[in-house]
Design a protein with these regions (language model features):
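Transmembrane alpha-helix signature in integral membrane proteins
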Residues: 80-108
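Generic hydrophobic transmembrane alpha-helix motif, especially the helices
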Residues: 126-171
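Transmembrane alpha-helices
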Residues: 178-179, 201-237
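Amphipathic cytosolic juxtamembrane alpha-helices at the membrane-cytosol interface
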Residues: 22, 101, 114-119, 187-188, ...
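Transmembrane alpha-helical segments of polytopic membrane transport and secretion proteins
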Residues: 1-33, 293-304
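Cytoplasmic-entry segments and transmembrane alpha-helices of multi-pass inner-membrane transporters
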Residues: 101-140, 304
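C-terminal transmembrane helix and the adjacent membrane-cytosol boundary/short C-terminal tail
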Residues: 180-184, 188, 195, 262-304
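Interhelical loop and adjacent transmembrane-helix boundary motif
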Residues: 235-283
Length: 304
């Protein structure tokens, strides 16, 4: 009985206006959290419901591993392996180009730049993150594509290489901003101890600061990869949009995102269902990237 009485005292009803306000705000916070959860659940259910029928009709093996896509032919073919490989190669290529540049930029901003120059570079990075995708695509189409064709002696510069270069530029803000935050969070005692033992600034940054900030840097890299694999408009303007296997950097290709974007406006029947199936595959890729991000962050927290 005594325990019950004490419990009732702890769970008291709101009495003052401040108590009522606190209760209302807590309820609003709860609703907002549940809204986010509901959005994820509804999107997931919708993607599965919309994407599974076409995979069932076409056959999962034929859909994922066939190399021919001819959705408007008399006898349509729905093989998305070229789209999957183009997305994977494009994303990996963008990471290979963008991650070293982004990481070195972050080290410079966090450790080496003077305040005035840091302000200028940070402002430029922030502006870069705010540029619309279509502007990146327009610049790539007008500058990068002709330059690639002229430099490598190709009839057209709209190819996988152009898409990789554009994506590598687009992922820089995510990598730089998150990596700078992670490097700034490294305890100064780590670096001071390294310098006191005779290490140079560069040795300290690469052997002490970067390893100590590895979980945050990894988070930035994964966020950048997520941006790259989900990009559509800019890539569609520079990649050529032909459903070819990406067997060369100079091959005109179609990515998962651009396949959906270029055909959805006129698609119908099984073709439209197949585009939803492509969206489901892309959704699974994004979910796997998010899972990888959580694993990396949890692993980094355990190490710390």
């Amino acid at each position: 009985m005594k325990n019950t009485t004490s419990s009732l005292r702890r769970v008291r009803l709101p009495r003052t206006p401040a108590d009522w306000l606190e209760a209302v705000m807590n309820f609003i916070f709860f609703l907002c959290g549940m809204l986010a959860v509901c959005c994820v659940v509804l999107i997931s259910v919708y993607m599965v419901v919309s994407g599974v029928p076409a995979i069932h009709k076409i056959g999962i093996f034929k859909f994922l591993f066939s190399t021919k896509w001819a959705s408007t032919a008399a006898e349509p073919l729905f093989g998305i392996l070229p789209f999957i490989l183009s997305s994977v190669y494009g994303t990996l290529g963008a990471a290979i180009l963008g991650v070293p540049i982004g990481l070195l930029t972050a080290v410079f901003l966090s450790k080496a730049a003077d305040p005035k120059l840091r302000t200028v570079v940070v402002t430029a990075i922030e502006l870069l993150s705010g540029i619309p995708s279509v502007v990146f695509g327009l610049l790539g189409m007008q500058v990068l594509v002709p330059a690639a064709a002229k430099t490598f002696g190709k009839a057209s510069g709209a190819c996988l290489l152009s898409a990789i270069v554009v994506l590598s530029i687009m992922i820089l803000p995510s990598i730089v901003s998150v990596s700078v935050t992670a490097l700034n969070a490294v305890p100064p005692e780590y670096e001071q101890g390294s310098l006191a033992l005779g290490a140079t600034d560069t040795e300290t940054w690469f052997k002490i600061s970067i390893p100590a900030a590895k979980s945050g840097i990894a988070a930035g890299v994964v966020l950048g990869i997520g941006r790259a694999i989900g990009e559509a408009m800019a890539v569609m303007m520079v990649a050529g949009n032909s459903p070819n296997m990406p067997d060369s950097l100079f091959r005109s290709v179609t990515l998962l995102t651009t396949a959906i974007a270029k055909e959805m406006s006129y698609a119908g029947g099984l073709q439209r269902q197949a585009l939803f199936s492509i969206a489901l595959v892309l959704f699974v890729f994004i979910m796997l990237i998010n899972v990888a991000l959580n694993v990396v962050l949890k692993g980094g927290n355990r190490d710390e």
